[in-house]
Amino acid sequence: MALEDMEKRYRISDLSRELQVSPQEVLQFIRMNGGKVGSTSSMVNEEMRGMIFGNFSVEKKMVDEAMKIRAEKQRRLTRLEEQSRKTYEKEQQLRDSMHVAPLVPVAPLHVAQDVIVEVAAPPSAQADHTVQAEPAVQTESAVQTESAVQTESAVQTEPAVQTEPAVQTEPEVQTEPAAQTEPEVQTEPAAQTEPAAQTEPAAQTESAVQTEADLSDVGEVSIVPENVEVIDVPELPMVPVMPVKEEPSVNDQLVSFDIPQNIGGLTVVGTLDMMNPFDRSESGKMKARKKNFKEQADALKSEFDTPAGEEKLVDDKLVVKKKPVKAAGDGDTAPAADDALAGKKKPGKKKKKPDVDEKVISANIRTTISGMDDSAGSVSRQKFRKMRRMEREKEHEAAEAFRESQRAIVRVTEYASPHELAELMGVTAKEIIQKCFALGKFVTINQRLDKESLELIALEFGFEAEFISEIEATAVVAEVDDAEDLLIRPPVVTIMGHVDHGKTSLLDYIRNSNVVAGESGGITQHIGAYEVTVEGNRKITFLDTPGHEAFTAMRARGAQVTDIVILVVAADDSVMPQTIEAINHAKAAGVPIVVAINKIDKPAANPEKIKTQLSEAGVLVEDWGGEYQCQEISAKQGIGIEELMGKLLTEAEIRELKGNFSEDVLASGIIIESELDKGKGVISTVLVQRGYLRVGDPFVAGNTMGRVRALMDERSKRIHEAGPSQPVRVLGFEALPQSGDVLTVMASDRDARELAQKRQVIRREHEFRRSTRVKLDSIARQIREGLMKELSVIIKADTDGSIQALADGLMKIHNEEVKVQIIHQGVGQITETDVLLAAASDAIIIGFRVRPNVNAKKLAEKEDLDVRFYSVIYHVLEDVEKALEGMLSPELHEESLGSLEIRQVFRVPKVGNVGGCYALEGKVFRDSKVRLLRDGVQVYDGQLDTLRRFKDDVKEVDAGYECGLSLKNYDDIKVGDIVEAYKIVEKKRKL
């Protein structure tokens, strides 16, 4: 049953990828519906999965519905085209059997291939006729169907008389009533652009007769083949015919169509009112179809109207696709007659029927779908937008406050000159010197000022002095990254926690390699930088920091360069001081924390106790309603590791980590660790943060410079370049850089060398002045307080990070009487110079994971120096602490031995007074210190001169015995006095 339940559960992150929505939106939806989930890596059942798909699949439903509407429209158009084709074939058969009227003689015109002349038939025929002739320049008729069948026809008898193309109708045959009399051919001036072919009722008989008379005077019309010679004829007089406005009983239409090529002469159309298949006039069925489609479009648009959509909507909220209006006389296409001739309308005032624009409808459907998607997750998106807006406002306010504060802060290096300070504050050097004179300091323009003087002078000018290092003062300003160069980069994850809580074991399982075996004592003593490929071919860079208290600087440095912190806490232990310190480092750096409760496979594991202690430390996990993700794991068994990786990737997706991957930008990174190799020289572990670091690039790092000679990954495999978030080992430093220094690629070796030399000059000057002052202060302190005991040491280690950790740990071991004085520290093996320096300063040499060379070893034996070697930092700190405790003065304690009562006093010649005593308690020794008490008041403190029983000298007297004694250099003893015997005991002190 348990296996079946597992098969029916789904991970939230997988569902979000399947639906192509944000994991946070899915998480918010589950919580809004009463679901209790901790993070996007949590599992949900089949029922909740159905709810999620029902909510977030609205977009798919709307897209499917839009596709159905589009398919239905295409199907209807296809069916309409098929019906039109069949109707047109039937009409052709009827047209061949129609009555043909006598030919009307017309003067020769400019005629091309097809000539269609339609004239009015006699009243008995009750048919409409239209005379059309195609000009030499072919024009496109507005009569065309969806299948792109085009016919070219136009009436052009003379320049002044122009007729318009026939109107568009549905392919249906309409007959007119018999009461209709002879219609006419209506002509309009050339400037008129509206359709001119329009039938009139029987009241217009006079105009019709006149038109027939004019046509009878024109000569005979003959069909000219395609390539015949055109004959010019005189222009005919224009006979304008104005329509008589009267409401017709039935909508009359003029229909034009092509005459077959095998028919010659003039063709007269019969009485049938046939429909052209390319006519677009509104019929009942087409109107119903358009109305149905319009209602569907309006239903979608009315719910979610956008400002852009409102501008495009016309009348009934359908976009009218207007055709270009051009004069018919210039050979271009005239506007199409989109509506039928129905009702009483004024010429030039006809309103075109709207045509649906499919592109606009598709855009509106997409807008509707987007709106429905927003409404589905409106709560989470609105909350997210509100939070982002508030964050931007806070950032803007903080930036404004920062700019205001910067106006009153001057950033200056220690021991700056008046000239440099004047440039920073925007005043003259003369004013600075005058202020110094007013403060009682006589300085020159290039003289160096100490820290107190700089602070006082800055306050005099209304500034607050902020002291920076020489590296910050000469930092290279990076260019602003282009948005197009910023791409998603792998996250940098730092594993932090207390010692022996399983940080390296966790990384060991992830990397599938035994890292702990390579560390002395089973604890991590370096920052290890590794790049790991996880599920989905995604990369994560891990930094493994030491957990011992001596490596505080390393943990702080790891928190400053990381994106996510994994806080490892042992379930069978508790939240330790280094755990609290790691939490503070992460919070100070603004880095998100993912809690990993390790060792849950042990019997004594108690994860709930760990969560309680974490909440007391300010880390409230998601299971308890907090914001920090938590995962119970076992680094040895691999339990929960996959879920932990999923939470890391989810956190990285939320933060949208990006880096500059441009090929042209100068690379930069941070020094994680440095060491001195005997064969390769200085090797530094660098975490690239921007651009690509390549072999041959000149660079500057701190006070040193160099050129990249080789790049190696964590497995010592040579590579050619390293991108953002990639750790790499770099060879090519001229000197050993410090951990935490920024490595910046320069344009040339010259620029790198100049910047490094400038920093070195400032550093040497600062160290010289600082060391001189320390010596003077040391002399003054020794005069005031007496000589302080100091343990002088020289530290040599394998890496710069280990040196810093050792130095920090040793400097913490001190009190008012003793302390550690580090004379020299460096990376690499112990040399003869180190031995000579130790002999001159009476110091001991501490070698951490390094050994002396042969000459140094012989010299140390000759000088009888104490050289100690260690590989675990515990042992170094313990031995140094014992040595300092041995230098402390011991504590003195008084221990009572016994007491005697003087009961009789004897006077002995040449000796003085001797007391006869009785031992009350304890034991009194001959060499014991004694004090004489009289009435409870001490009157003597010294030693015994003699101690006898009877006439014999004894060494001790026990309680209950009598004895005689005399005090050294004291003779005033009386009966009743009490003699107390005691001794002073020395006790070693602890730091």
UniProtKB/Swiss-Prot annotation:
PROSITE patterns for the chain: G_TR_2, IF2
GO-annotated molecular function: GTP binding; GTPase activity; translation initiation factor activity
Annotated region (G4), positions in chain: 598-601
Family matches, as Gene3D superfamilies: P-loop containing nucleotide triphosphate hydrolases (3.40.50.300), Translation factors (2.40.30.10), Translation initiation factor IF- 2, domain 3 (3.40.50.10050)
Ranges for domain tr-type G: 488-658
Record InterPro entries: EF-G-like_DII, IF2_II, IF2_N, P-loop_NTPase, Small_GTP-bd, T_Tr_GTP-bd_dom, TF_IF2_bacterial-like, TIF_IF2
Composition skew (Basic residues), residue ranges: 343-353
Protein task: One of the essential components for the initiation of protein synthesis. Protects formylmethionyl-tRNA from spontaneous hydrolysis and promotes its binding to the 30S ribosomal subunits. Also involved in the hydrolysis of GTP during the formation of the 70S ribosomal complex.
Family: Belongs to the TRAFAC class translation factor GTPase superfamily. Classic translation factor GTPase family. IF-2 subfamily.
HAMAP family, per the entry: IF_2_B
The name this protein goes by in its record: Translation initiation factor IF-2
Source species of the chain: Chlorobium phaeobacteroides (strain DSM 266 / SMG 266 / 2430)
Phylogenetic lineage: Bacteria, Pseudomonadati, Chlorobiota, Chlorobiia, Chlorobiales
Gene: infB
